[in-house]
Amino acid sequence: MSGGPIEFRCLECGECCRRLLIDSRLIRKGLPLFPDECGLFPRELIRPGVGIGQPGEPGFRVISYQMTEMVCPHLDEGSCGIWETRPTVCRSYPYMPVVTQGGYVTKEASLECTSLMMEAARRHGVFKIDEGSLEGELRALEKLSGITVEAVENLDEAWSYDLRGGRWVRFERLRP
């Protein structure tokens, strides 16, 4: 490994905006959105994301939504057309919240990020990110993690919406 922690720098390649659908275990998920962020995208591209309660029953509430497309409609020649108002998940990148086997929510850096992949190759796969260069991203990640934390805290009532099957799947079935 060469040097100390790296300072994350976005290369504005747009790759993170071209791989928005994730096939994980039993479902396909899209770009997660808070309810107040749904207006950033055309209505026909939005589906539920995570819900608490029993789908179809009174009291069921959707706590997040998701965008259904692989490529962001706001991507314009490698840059974001809504940079100033982009969704929280975009603000948190390259970090994403993940649930560990013990049920804890932690952060994980995406090695699909071109900038991080280049640094990993240069440093033979071992490096640490200078999180001081990612203050805004970490604040956004904390907000985004709230959805996952609420789902884990309500595991017996939490559901994720599968874009492939168009159905709700129990959140607990998706845990590692």
Predicted regions and their residues:
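Short loop/turn segments that flank or connect secondary-structure elements
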Residues: M1-P176
